[in-house]
A protein has these predicted regions:
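Short, amphipathic alpha-helical "recognition" segments used to contact nucleic acids or chromatin
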Residues: 1-12
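Short alpha-helical basic/polar micro-motif
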Residues: 3, 16, 125
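Conserved hydrophobic/aromatic pocket- or pore-lining residues that grip, position, or stack substrates
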Residues: 5, 18, 35, 64
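DNA-recognition alpha helix
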Residues: 16-27
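RNase H-like nuclease fold core
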Residues: 25-28, 37-129, 133, 137-145
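Inter-helix linker motif
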Residues: 143-155
């Protein structure tokens, strides 16, 4: 049952949705606390993945954010998930990381880029971005030789 709950959680279902789904499909009653206890087990694994060492050089790094609205304390607020995808020198893609934020900003991206450097990235040849104001400055502050390409469609 834990695997089913984790699978539903990974697909973005809320604790309440998971609880209702388990009741509807399996006829079992589980508490919010039980669902939370099970889903909390993946947090250390996710943290370890987010902090893992990275390759020293990437041919291309794609940097983008996905924007969405969530309900928080009775209000609808805008959030962003930042994502960095690297293409290594052998042509393999790797999700370098994902970070949550309030909204997309060059300042937050500078923090992300410094985090990539701290995890072992020494250089990237090309950075593909959405032309966010100040993004080029943030990239060149961390990776001064990187060529910047602007894409027309987001990831």
């Amino acid at each position: 049952m834990e695997e089913k709950i984790l699978s539903m959680y990974a697909k973005g279902m809320t604790t309440g949705d998971i609880k209702a789904h388990i009741q509807d499909i399996y006829g079992l009653s589980v508490s919010d606390t039980t669902v939370s206890r099970i889903t909390d087990k993946i947090l250390p694994v996710a943290k370890e993945w987010q902090q893992r060492p990275l390759e020293s050089i990437y041919a291309v790094v794609f940097l983008d954010a996905i924007h969405y609205h969530v309900r928080s304390e009775g209000q609808i607020v805008k959030k962003a998930v930042y994502i960095a995808i690297g293409l290594d020198l052998d042509g393999r893609k790797d999700v370098l990381g994902m970070w949550g934020g309030e909204n997309e900003s060059a300042k937050f991206w500078a923090t992300v880029l410094n985090g990539l450097r701290n995890r072992g990235v020494e250089d990237t040849f090309i950075a593909c971005t959405d032309n966010l104001t100040g993004f080029d400055t943030a990239i060149h502050a961390v990776f001064p030789e990187t060529e910047i390409r602007v894409y027309e469609k987001t990831l």
